[in-house]
Amino acid sequence: MNNNMYNAIKHHLSDNILLGYSSGSLPEAFSLMVASHISLCSTCRAQLESFDAIGGEVLNSSVETDTPMASDSLNATLALIREGPTHKPVPSRVDDRVLPRPIQDYVGGGLADVKWRAIGMGVKQAILPTSDAASARLLFIPAGAAMPDHGHQGLELTMVLQGAFKDEDDYFARGDIEMADSEMHHTPIADINEDCICLVVLDARLKFDGLIPKIMQRFAQM
């Protein structure tokens, strides 16, 4: 991906999320989101590198002063990052222009290898195999279609991989991140020019209002 792609990203990960990734404290699904985003976003990648550097200084300082570190120290959590996710996804070597390499490793290939499951109104999803602390899925929304109006019981991160969507006054294109929490109620609408594919991670179920969306939710496990 070229530098124009990097510079086009306008909606980034929060510092708290990046710090969590650097320390190894994020659930696997959220770590997948960070790894995927920084593969596209030079801004967040640089910020993460600065946090990692600070963590390295902390480690060096503790070694120099012979200060004992706790079992949940930065040293241990950084080791978790190096070890990778618990289910050990198969590395992918597919040249795919939609799925970042971290997602390809979970899919076992490129976009053509995604095992989509229809959940209603033209929307499809593919749940990715992550730990139970949070869920990760690829979501396919037809061009011009709207996701049902919903709220949140926890944190939802959505990153656009193909196409774009509009939410209130904000517009999210490839690489952009939308963060939604328990105070947010919204109805994302896919851009009419192209089908929208997103990576979505959740640490709690969504709250749908209508009867049909609630029925869909049972099948979608969202």
Which residues does each PLM region occupy?
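Positively biased amphipathic helices and basic secretion/translocation or surface-docking motifs
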Residues: 1-14, 28-30, 39-42, 46, ...
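Conserved short histidine dyad/triad with adjacent acidic residue
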Residues: 118-124, 129-152, 181-185, 219
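Glycine- and acidic-residue-biased ligand/ion/polar-headgroup-sensing regions
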Residues: 142-145, 151-167
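Ligand-binding loop in jelly-roll beta-barrel domains
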Residues: 184-208
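Amphipathic alpha-helical interface segments
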Residues: 204-222
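Short beta-strand His + acidic residue motifs that chelate non-heme Fe in jelly-roll/DSBH
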Residues: 48, 147-149, 168, 186-192
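Short acidic-glycine-tyrosine-enriched beta hairpin
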Residues: 167-186
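Short Cys/His-rich Zn2+-coordinating modules
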Residues: 19-28
